Structure formats: structure tokens, C-alpha cells
């Protein structure tokens, strides 16, 4: 169960659960690949938790003009 950040906090930043999952997943993969963190302090030791913390903090957003090349 997700306690922090709360789903309500996350959905305040991203308009749908699907978009939230896609954004968090892509960011977690970037962090696994060695991308620089966007926050100075994280509560979660896992990359998916860190990605969700970045979204909740407003440090990470979806670019509506970006085309998904993986599709």
C-alpha cells in the first residue's frame, strides 16, 4: 500500500492514474540508468518511490507536446 506520497497528492500533479503510472515508471528507469536526482532528500530507497516523490513535489511533469516514441 502506498503511504507516502499519497495518491491524492500525486493525482493533484498528474491528471490520470494511467499518466501517473507511465510518468513514474519512465522516471524510475531514468534513475536506474544513472540520471541525476531532482530532489536533495528522499524518504524512499527505491527508484519508483523516488520518482513518485519527485512527482508529488512538482519537480517532474508530463510534457504534453512530447510524442511517445516507444508506442
Curated annotation (Swiss-Prot):
GO function terms (MF aspect): DNA binding; DNA-directed RNA polymerase activity
GO biological process, one term: DNA-templated transcription
Reaction catalysed by this enzyme: RNA(n) + a ribonucleoside 5'-triphosphate = RNA(n+1) + diphosphate
Assigned keywords, A-Z: DNA-directed RNA polymerase, Nucleotidyltransferase, Transcription, Transferase
Phylogenetic lineage: Bacteria, Bacillati, Bacillota, Bacilli, Lactobacillales
Annotated GO CC locations: DNA-directed RNA polymerase complex
SMART domains for this protein: RNA_pol_Rpb6 (SM01409)
Subunit structure: The RNAP catalytic core consists of 2 alpha, 1 beta, 1 beta' and 1 omega subunit. When a sigma factor is associated with the core the holoenzyme is formed, which can initiate transcription.
Enzyme Commission (EC) number: 2.7.7.6
Protein name: DNA-directed RNA polymerase subunit omega
InterPro entries recorded: DNA-dir_RNA_pol_omega (IPR003716), Pol_omega/Rpo6/RPB6 (IPR006110), RPB6/omega-like_sf (IPR036161)
Family membership: Belongs to the RNA polymerase subunit omega family.
Enzyme class: transferase
Task of the protein: Promotes RNA polymerase assembly. Latches the N- and C-terminal regions of the beta' subunit thereby facilitating its interaction with the beta and alpha subunits.
Amino acid at each position: 500500500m502506498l503511504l507516502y506520497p499519497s495518491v491524492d497528492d500525486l493525482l493533484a500533479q498528474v491528471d490520470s492514474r494511467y499518466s501517473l503510472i507511465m510518468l513514474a515508471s519512465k522516471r524510475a528507469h531514468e534513475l536506474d540508468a544513472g540520471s541525476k536526482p531532482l530532489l536533495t532528500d528522499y524518504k524512499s530507497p527505491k527508484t519508483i518511490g523516488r520518482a513518485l516523490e519527485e512527482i508529488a513535489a512538482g519537480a517532474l511533469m508530463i510534457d504534453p507536446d512530447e510524442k511517445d516514441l516507444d508506442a
